[in-house]
């Protein structure tokens, strides 16, 4: 057949039959819709399985990363610890002198006295050592004589009497600084490890080929071994050493110096400290023993609250006095107050070396809450030591303890140690601090407002309707009050300027007096009686330890009559009865 039709392909058999619809399911088979659903389910399961595998891989990678990080931290720890210990520095006071403390690996305690030489003691924690650089030491014989005057020796008595407590506070600060320096070194080393992990992206190929992981680890191990080895090998002294004769056989039996002049000076100085320490300790013991007898003879006359009252023990300006700390502790055990309050100046200079006196004072409370508004002779170091000992240090916020709401703050001024000069801890005056506390109290009416200086207390007490039932302060080492401010609603505020609980005479105190002496003036402690229903202070009873070790218990001073309290005020304050509970004066 010729023409176009001849080139056509012949039709296959059945080619002209109509096509079956796509949705027709052959008998016994799976239709297209069901097949699509099956394929969708399969793909979902496949994706889920892939996701599970990826999560497992992610967790595996994360676990490997954490393990490598942990190994890196452990590997870096030795060098970080060495760096931290060898770079720890602290500035503080020992006695009246400004001192720099620096830890090292010399294996001994070196006291650098400038031009007159150095003193050395074996370190109790070898190979770790300590360099103590004492400031303000001159080279002339006249200056050396002033260093070991009776006043200066008295200031160093605590170092001889309680060397462990005096040094431990400084060691704590050094340890904190060493940890901080060590953490910084650890971070730098870990950054180096992270950089090593990214070396292929950061370094040229020829360096990568030469410095392999195995070689890097070997180099690091050698460096660590050399550093640790150099620390453990004892170092021989470079300069000649001369023993201090008075130290032979005593607690400083290993004391040596590198100067003959210094050996003679320390010989005389340690003799003076030993003599003065023995004298002071005996005086403290005699005072405590005599005062304890006077206390035991008057147990029945000690302050006692009525059944509907609680009792607060308050004091101020203890100044680390050892004798009074012991006697106040006995007084607290005998009277069992519900809470203790200090209006500050608990230390002499606020140095780390006064940790021992802070621990003794904290033990006075015998388990009851102890709250403090620190004074101008205390410091941030003092506050940290108090918190560590369990004392609540007020910081401008209301604190709830033993059913009392107490508001107070530390003094904005701080005395330079062993000086009458003061510096500002923050840009705030006494009056501004007091107004801030008044504004914070607002209409909440705290139970107690606690400050240190009268300048602050004056602002609070001159406020219309002072926002506290009890306002306490100290600072002047002289009792004044109680002063009662009546409110418009018939309630009242009691204000009290407390004397010195340490019996410290101010002129002597500023001349480097020491906590290791009996009270020089009346040592005063106060008991405040608080009505449980209304929270009002109904009485004050001062207790005095005189310089002759006699105990004087004043009569209870009534500060308010609950019977005259308006009924609506009583109900608002929480009291339901109008019956007076004021105890008559004894």
Name what the model sees in each region.
Residues 207, 302, 315, 320-400:
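Core catalytic region of metal-dependent phosphoesterases/phosphodiesterases
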Residues 362-364, 368-371, 453-583:
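Conserved beta-sheet core of the metallophosphoesterase superfamily
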Residues 333-335, 402-407, 413-494:
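His/acidic metal-ligating clusters that form di-metal
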Residues 2-298, 567-586:
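Non-catalytic terminal accessory segments
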Residues 286-306, 318, 326-336, 384-388, ...:
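Extracytosolic and intramembrane catalytic regions of membrane-associated proteins
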Residues 272-285, 309-324, 347-352, 415-428, ...:
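Acidic/histidine-rich helix-loop elements
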Residues 316-319, 344-346, 376-377, 410-412, ...:
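Active-site metal-binding loops of divalent metal-dependent hydrolases
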Residues 259-271, 303-312, 397-408, 413, ...:
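Beta-strand-turn-beta hairpins that frame and shape the catalytic cleft
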């Amino acid at each position: 057949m010729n023409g176009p039709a001849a080139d056509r392909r012949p039709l296959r058999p059945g080619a002209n039959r109509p096509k079956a619809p796509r949705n027709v399911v052959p008998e016994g088979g799976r239709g297209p819709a069901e097949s699509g659903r099956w394929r969708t389910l399969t793909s979902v399961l496949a994706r889920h399985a892939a996701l599970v595998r990826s999560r497992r891989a992610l967790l595996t990678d994360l676990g490997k990363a954490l393990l490598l990080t942990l190994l890196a931290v452990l590997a870096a720890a030795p060098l970080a610890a060495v760096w931290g210990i060898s770079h720890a520095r602290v500035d503080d006071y020992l006695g009246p002198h400004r001192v720099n403390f620096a830890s090292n690996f010399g294996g001994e305690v070196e006291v650098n006295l400038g031009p007159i030489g150095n003193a050395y003691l074996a370190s109790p924690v070898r190979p770790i050592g300590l360099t103590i650089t004492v400031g303000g030491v001159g080279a002339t014989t006249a200056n050396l004589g002033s260093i070991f005057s009776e006043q200066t020796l008295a200031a160093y008595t605590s170092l001889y009497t309680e060397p462990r407590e005096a040094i431990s506070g400084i060691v704590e600060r050094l340890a904190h600084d060493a940890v901080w320096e060590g953490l910084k070194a650890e971070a730098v080393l870990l950054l180096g490890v992270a950089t090593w992990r990214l070396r292929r992206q950061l370094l040229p190929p020829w360096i990568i080929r030469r410095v392999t992981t195995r070689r890097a680890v070997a180099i690091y191990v050698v460096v660590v071994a050399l550093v640790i080895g150099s620390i453990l090998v004892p170092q021989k002294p470079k300069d000649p050493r001369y023993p201090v004769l008075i130290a032979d056989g005593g607690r400083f039996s290993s004391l040596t110096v590198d100067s003959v002049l210094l050996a003679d000076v320390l010989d005389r100085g340690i003799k003076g400290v030993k003599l003065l320490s023995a004298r002071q300790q005996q005086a403290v013991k005699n005072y405590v023993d005599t005062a304890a007898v006077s206390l035991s003879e008057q147990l029945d006359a000690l302050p006692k609250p009525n059944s509907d009252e609680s009792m607060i023990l308050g004091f101020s300006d203890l100044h680390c006095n050892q004798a009074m700390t012991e006697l106040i502790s006995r007084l607290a055990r005998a009277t069992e107050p519900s809470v203790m309050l200090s209006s500050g100046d608990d230390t002499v200079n606020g140095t780390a070396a006064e940790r021992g006196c802070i621990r003794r004072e904290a033990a006075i409370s015998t388990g009851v809450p102890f709250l403090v508004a620190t004074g101008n002779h205390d410091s941030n170091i003092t506050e940290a030591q108090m918190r560590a000992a369990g004392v609540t240090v007020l910081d401008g916020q209301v604190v709830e303890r033993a059913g009392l709401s107490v508001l107070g703050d530390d003094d904005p001024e701080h005395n330079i140690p062993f000086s009458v000069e003061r510096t500002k801890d923050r840009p705030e005056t006494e009056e501004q601090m007091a107004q801030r506390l008044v504004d914070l109290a607002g209409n909440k009416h705290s139970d107690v407002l606690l400050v240190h200086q009268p300048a602050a207390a004056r602002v609070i007490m001159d406020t219309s309707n002072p926002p506290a039932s009890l306002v306490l302060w100290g600072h002047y080492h002289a009792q004044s009050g109680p002063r009662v401010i009546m409110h418009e609603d018939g309630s009242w505020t009691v204000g009290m300027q407390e004397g010195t609980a340490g019996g410290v005479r101010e002129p002597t105190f500023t001349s480097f007096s020491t906590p290791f002496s009996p009270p020089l003036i009346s040592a005063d402690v106060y008991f405040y009686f608080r009505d449980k229903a209304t929270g009002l202070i109904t009485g004050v009873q001062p207790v005095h330890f005189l310089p002759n070790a006699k105990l004087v218990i004043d009569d209870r001073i009534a500060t308010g009559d609950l019977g005259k309290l308006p009924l609506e005020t009583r109900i608002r304050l929480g009291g339901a009865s109008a019956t007076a509970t004021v105890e008559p004066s004894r």
